[in-house]
Amino acid sequence: MDRILFLDNSIKNDLYKPLAYWEPVLQLDFDSYRASAGDLPHDLDDYSHIFISGSTASVLANADWIEAEQELIRTAVGQGKVVVGSCFGHQIIARALFGDGAVRKRRALDVGWPEIEILADDALLGEAGSKIYGYVFHYDEVCKIDENEATAIARSDACEILAFKLKDRPVWGVQPHFEMGIVDGLKFLELVKGEGVPDRQSYLKSTVKPPKDSGWIIPFMKAYHKARPFQA
């Protein structure tokens, strides 16, 4: 039976509540665990799919819960589960599989609705050469993957590895927040406003890079649910 394990990486009293965005597009029964509070299932036998959420935490922190989640990710990949990580989820998959050097702190916040270039044909992101738009907000980034094991499948002008997929497993890391549309993204900017964070009005007034969203959440999640676990 298909069932999703949703790993909620939000922090106590967090501004970002992942499940509020993702639950409306989850088409299978699911269980949610607060991974950031050390809450993880004892095993993965009940799950075909795993979804790893974003977080306002840094994946570079050497916290016990981050180490435990990385171990779960390695187990899930070894068992052939369908695994998708968004934002922090994208980064923690990379760190779990490719080592600590796979993720680094950016020189500056990457935020907005960039043009996303699809580098390879992919079930979740579409055809190679196509362009889509989606919201990003991240201080850390995936900077290295093992090219023998994974393929970079999307980039932007500000981030060379905006998404990747394992070559022989249904495992994806995707930096953009496709679950957050333009209004959601602007609201989030207002909530976290501070040094280095652009004012939401700057996007509303911009004639050069106004907010643009492709609504990719729908094809993205349809493909996620259709993906099948790997059978050795």
Residues of each region from the PLM?
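Amide-donor transfer/coupling interface in amidating biosynthetic enzymes
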Residues: D2-K12, I118-A232
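N-terminal beta1-alpha1 cap of cysteine-dependent amidohydrolase-like domains
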Residues: M1-K81, G196-A232
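Cysteine-nucleophile active-site neighborhood
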Residues: S53-A120
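Conserved beta-strand termini and adjacent loop/short-helix elements that scaffold enzyme active sites
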Residues: Y33-S36, R106, F137, R155
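Short glycine-/acidic-enriched loop or helix-start segments at secondary-structure transitions
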Residues: Y16-K17, A61-A63, I93-A96, D146, ...
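Short, glycine/charged-enriched secondary-structure capping and boundary segments
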Residues: L19-W22, Y47, D64-E67, L97-G101, ...
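Catalytic metal-binding/acid-base residues of hydrolase active sites
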Residues: R34, A57, G89, D140, ...
